[in-house]
């Protein structure tokens, strides 16, 4: 096991510990069932950690692709808005919609067939070389097996580099962990600024005697209410 893999596992259990402390509601029946199943299958937690790390990285990679597509769509929309039609644009305009759709569909089907053929050969070819390798070396195969179904399995396989998927996991999760640590540090600093300073709680009570609290009381001008009332009455 590499040091990076050790850090990822410890970070995952640290986050689970925080959830355990913050979330008090749990289904007792489900909890007992899970504990019994883990006792019967002690190695299941090993594969669950692999699956969680792979799925977490896959979600982050998909979010990045979604953001890229949104940016491309916004750029295309802005270009279409800024593009001014000419006098003969409508007359010379063609409608290649049906052709492009059929062309795109054929390309998509070819790419899908190629990816499926590549993905079906990956587990058998890499099983012998990754049997005694690191923790995350065969995590992608574990996650695809847990996902169930060819569609979800191919989706996970297509998101990662098939030769070194663990490097992508290191990059994605380490970046998110660093940002979470920074946010947690900022929240701690902000929370400390709102707290009451209790450093002076051990200060002797003599400093808070009546003489000190009312030392300036005699120096202030004292007006007799009776004199004011008499003057106003006259």
Swiss-Prot record:
Pfam families, per the entry: DUF2076
UniProt superkingdom:
Bacteria
What ranges does the record give for the region Disordered, renumbered to this chain? 199-234
Name used for this protein in its record: Uncharacterized protein BUsg_175
Native organism is Buchnera aphidicola subsp. Schizaphis graminum (strain Sg)
What lineage does UniProt assign to this protein's organism? Answer: Bacteria, Pseudomonadati, Pseudomonadota, Gammaproteobacteria, Enterobacterales
């Amino acid at each position: 096991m590499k040091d990076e893999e050790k850090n990822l596992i410890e970070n995952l259990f640290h986050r689970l510990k925080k959830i355990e402390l913050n979330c008090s509601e749990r289904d007792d029946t489900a909890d007992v069932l899970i504990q019994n199943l883990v006792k019967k299958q002690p190695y299941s937690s090993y594969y669950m950690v692999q699956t969680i790390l792979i799925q977490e990285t896959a979600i982050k990679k998909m979010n990045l692709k979604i953001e890229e597509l949104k940016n491309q769509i916004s750029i295309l929309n802005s270009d279409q808005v800024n593009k001014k039609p000419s006098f003969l644009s409508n007359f010379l305009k063609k409608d290649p919609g049906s052709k492009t759709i059929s062309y795109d569909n054929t390309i998509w089907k070819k790419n899908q067939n190629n990816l499926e053929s590549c993905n079906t050969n990956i587990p058998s070819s890499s099983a012998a070389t990754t049997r005694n390798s690191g923790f995350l070396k065969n995590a992608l195969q574990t996650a695809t097996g847990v996902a169930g179904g060819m569609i979800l399995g191919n989706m996970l396989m297509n998101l990662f580099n098939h030769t070194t998927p663990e490097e992508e996991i290191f990059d994605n999760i380490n970046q998110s962990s660093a940002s979470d640590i920074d946010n947690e540090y900022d929240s701690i600093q902000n929370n400390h600024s709102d707290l009451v300073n209790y450093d002076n709680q051990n200060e002797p009570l003599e400093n808070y005697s009546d003489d000190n609290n009312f030392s300036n009381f005699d120096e202030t001008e004292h007006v007799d209410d009776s004199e004011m009332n008499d003057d106003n009455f006259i």
